[in-house]
Amino acid sequence: MAKQAIKRAKILAVKNNNKIGVLLINLGTPDEPSVPAVRRYLRQFLSDPKVIDVPSLVRWIIVHLCILPFRPKRSAKLYQKIWMPEGSPLLVYSEMLRERVGETLGDDFCVALGMRYGKPSIETALKKLQEAQCRQLIVLPLFPQYSTSTTASALEGVRAKNSFKEMTVIDRFFEEPHYIDSMTTLIHENLNEFQPDYFLFSYHGLPERHLVKSGCQLAICNRKNNCSPISSSNENCYRAQCFETSRLIAKKLNLTDQQYGVAFQSRLGRAKWIEPYTDKYLIELSKKGIKKLMVVCPSFPVDCLETLEEIGIRAQSQWQRLGGETLKLIPSLNAHPQWVNAIAKMAKKSLQLF
């Protein structure tokens, strides 16, 4: 069925000289690691009501009076530690991914990259696909686990600028076999040179209230424990999706429950965020005598500040202070060949939805 749908789509595209557009969306990055550039980026990012979901006046006060006067200077210094000669790692690797996915999909497709915040914008990416005479649009936010502050916000940005009449969306892929296999292969490649005592899957955190707003009917569960397997009661719960991704990867790696754990990083502000917190989890692991730790960040398909600096530098330093021997950060999928093929397969599979 899938092969027939793909064949029909290809024939239609060639017959009408129209391509199928694929829009890859990532979060975004400052233009440069300077205070003004970081301030512009943070202003746009944090002004999104899906990111800081409080009344507009309260959000304005938080952003303009509590964050922007102080955070840009600190964040700029962090970006400077990871900035590449070619530019922001997130942008460099995302562009590399876009190019290779385009090469893999072939001439019947046109692949564009849009950032929810910063450049290239979603609007710019959509214009490129329109100029390429694409008639159908496949939207793939590069966020494996669905959340309102990432996926829903990105899709809102698309709908605000979209003129395509035929559009399909891949709004999550946390349990997609091609994604899980790509993650497993990446980890296996790094196991050839490092054998850890323990695996830690570290995901981007969210305020707990976001889980309730997502419709999770298990909001009363003790969030310090593992989430239940995905069901109709928690299928939109970001935390549950993270645990499901971890379970699937661990199963592929033949790990027992005692060999891996799940934690959440990058919390901001004083609100209650989903637990356990990555930095505190490291403390608990050190108390258990763990010395060699492998950290995997499945919610970040592309390396960025949160992986390279927060884990690769800060968590590494914390681990050494705690008496750990080695903290090995697994690179993000970036433009790994298997991941490129996985995206191409997901895009082709989505053609059945037109």
Curated annotation (Swiss-Prot):
Pathway annotation from the record: Porphyrin-containing compound metabolism; protoheme biosynthesis; protoheme from protoporphyrin-IX: step 1/1
Entry GO MF terms: ferrochelatase activity; metal ion binding
Domain of life: Bacteria
Enzyme Commission no: 4.98.1.1
Compartments it resides in: Cytoplasm
TM region positions: none
A Gene Ontology term for the protein's cellular component: cytoplasm
Family annotation (InterPro entries): Ferrochelatase, Ferrochelatase_AS, Ferrochelatase_C, Ferrochelatase_N
Protein name: Ferrochelatase
Species assigned in the record: Coxiella burnetii (strain CbuG_Q212) (Coxiella burnetii (strain Q212))
Taxonomic placement: Bacteria, Pseudomonadati, Pseudomonadota, Gammaproteobacteria, Legionellales
